[in-house]
Amino acid sequence: MAPSQQEKYDIVIVGAGPVGIVLSLCMSRWGYKVKHIDNRPVPTATGRADGIQPRSTEILRNLGLKRQIMAFKPAKVYDVAFWDPLPGGQGIHRTGSWPSCPRFIDTRYPFTTLVHQGKIERVFLDEIQKAGTTVERPWTIVGFKNDGLDETYPVEVQLKSIDTNVIETVRTKYLFSGEGARSFIRQQLGIQIQYKDPISYVWGVMDGVVRTNFPDIETKCTIHSDAGSIMVIPREDNMVRLYVQIASSDDPDFDPRKTATAEDVQATARKILQPYWVEWDRVEWYSVYPIGQGISEKYTLDERVFMGGDACHTHSPKAGQGMNTAFHDALNMAWKLHAVESGLAKRSILSTYETERKDIAETLLSFDNKYAALFSKRRPTAGEVGEASHTTAAAGGEEDEFVKTFKSSCEFTSGYGVAYKPNVFTWDATHPAQSPLFDVPGVRLTPGRAFTPTTVTRLADSNHVHLEQEIPANGAFRIFIFAGKQDKTSKAITDLAANLEKERSFLSVYRRADIADVSFFENHLPHSKLFSICLVYAGEKNQIDVDSIPKILRDYHHHLYADNIPDVRVPQATYAAHEKLGFDVEKGGVVVTRPDSHVACTVQLSEGSGTVDALNAFFGSFATKPLGQDSQQSRL
């Protein structure tokens, strides 16, 4: 069939696991034509990933999905208990506990949400359907090539119905593999997985309903005993997940292909939990897997065919990072494709998908390797330790290292440790192309990290709102203007507004084509579909003169706020949001966040054109059109 006769798509997504469904939802909602297939006849029914970390919960809320997932009444894990062997082979005892999301991590969701992957998929699939895309099942990919025969849709993809063997050939701008560890697309590209270490541990995982007198069965636990190791994960519907060590490279007869029956794992669990007992009412799901940490050499070869999720990185599931990392992969991919296809960004920016996400995966694997080794390594038996075990030093020293690693890793495992390095989208004060305005004295935000949660009062309706959630995940860059005290910054705000209205400002150059028809009730994108603005004043609502706010900012009538809500993290502050983020209320400041809510840059709020000049310089570094005055020196 000639390319002109083939059905054309903006993107073809293969696989409907975590990375595929997030990417599919974003691209479908943002107006793209998506072809999405999965080789399974039905979505995940049981098992697989089940832990949503705090930062991922924040992302789900920004996607408008948190409420649906919480409707499943998932387990919420606020802390982790550590259990270790008693001396003399007398069983196990609790040696301590630690918050799963310690207070130094600023989050609204200081817990891990536990609900099985199938229920999470169900929520996404319903929303994908509402956005106009259907996941076609069971279909698989049998071939593809970037032949360039169609300049706009350069990739030809061959898909096959598993039920009927019918072959369908389509063309697409992009092809994305969310197929998992056995990715056909990765294999066809000849991209290898680099394994950090040979398989060292084999684990069994079992979901079921249990009866037990073990006191922490509803708490996440790491348990080391003379008989082996277990991790306990509470689940929804009175279930519990047990990860049970089956084999270790420390065993004289270690076999990485070793397997075990569900009954074998139950017997091992009973031994490990002594002196407590455990019995199973039912087993919902059971699997055996080896641990092998690996990462793909490349995430793309041509920036037309991409991969994400387990197709790119494999690791042990006990730190609960697989699904969460996939969410981040997908969101990163989605907003960058949108930036290019909307006409905002040059195609060259797509290279940052691999550099950013592979760097995070490397960090994950480094952490996971250490965490898995500490968790999986067998304790010395009571007989081996002998009388020395009475001091607990022999066993306790190793646990100290495990607990230390766990505590130091909390920020990373929560998702808030993700920090993208400086690049075209992430500018700090050291960026070579900068003006001094990118260095905001006292600011506490770090470019590359997630925007800090803050609570403010929305002027339109006096609602107390979470500022970081006020702009939904719509693919737009977010510009937060912390305007300080209105009487101190009125000229700076007037000048900023006047410069935003100039013909060559980023907001004007990328103005909506349908701006004359935009409804008064368009809360988020009244001027451009690529930028959204929020304005926060330090003061009480009744002290803020809305009429004196320039019209271009007043058009964001649902994005005008008063900074008047106390925050326990800055208890002495009169204006908590400004104080928490490090903005002087006499001067104010501006924060740009990327569409994934990671901080892109911070800019001083200055009189004249300087602030908008700086913003034009930032956006102009990747924009497809020239921004700003030719001299970049204009002043009002």
From Swiss-Prot:
Q: How does it sit in the membrane?
A: Single-pass membrane protein
The reactions it catalyses are: 4-hydroxybenzoate + NADH + O2 + H(+) = 3,4-dihydroxybenzoate + NAD(+) + H2O; 4-hydroxybenzoate + NADPH + O2 + H(+) = 3,4-dihydroxybenzoate + NADP(+) + H2O
Q: How is the cofactor bound?
A: Binds 1 FAD per subunit.
Intracellular or extracellular location(s): Membrane
Residues annotated for FAD binding in this entry: 10-39, 241-243, 289, 310
Tell me, using the record's free text, what induces this protein.
Expression is induced in the presence of caffeic acid, p-coumaric acid, p-hydroxybenzoic acid, protocatechuic acid, and benzoic acid.
Q: Where are the transmembrane segments?
A: 11-28
Question: What phenotype has been reported when the gene encoding this protein is knocked out?
Answer: Abolishes growth on benzoic acid, benzaldehyde, benzyl alcohol, p-anisic acid, p-anisyl alcohol, and p-hydroxybenzoic acid; and reduces growth on p-coumaric acid and cinnamic acid.
EC number(s) from the headed UniProt entry? 1.14.13.33
Q: Chief subcellular site?
A: membrane
Q: Which domain of life is it from?
A: Eukaryota
Q: What class of enzyme is it?
A: oxidoreductase
- Cofactor(s) for this protein? FAD
Gene Ontology cellular-component terms listed: membrane
Job description of the protein: FAD-dependent monooxygenase; part of the benzoic acid degradation pathway also known as the protocatechuic acid pathway. Benzoic acid debradation begins with the conversion of benzoic acid into 4-hydroxybenzoic acid through hydroxylation by the benzoate-4-monooxygenase bphA, and its partner NADPH-cytochrome P450 reductase cprA which act as a mediator in electron donation from NADPH. 4-Hydroxybenzoic acid is then converted into 3,4-dihydroxybenzoic acid (also called protocatechuic acid) by the p-hydroxybenzoate-m-hydroxylase phhA.
**Protein name, entry field:** p-hydroxybenzoate-m-hydroxylase A
Organism annotation: Aspergillus niger (strain ATCC MYA-4892 / CBS 513.88 / FGSC A1513)
Q: Which gene encodes it?
A: phhA
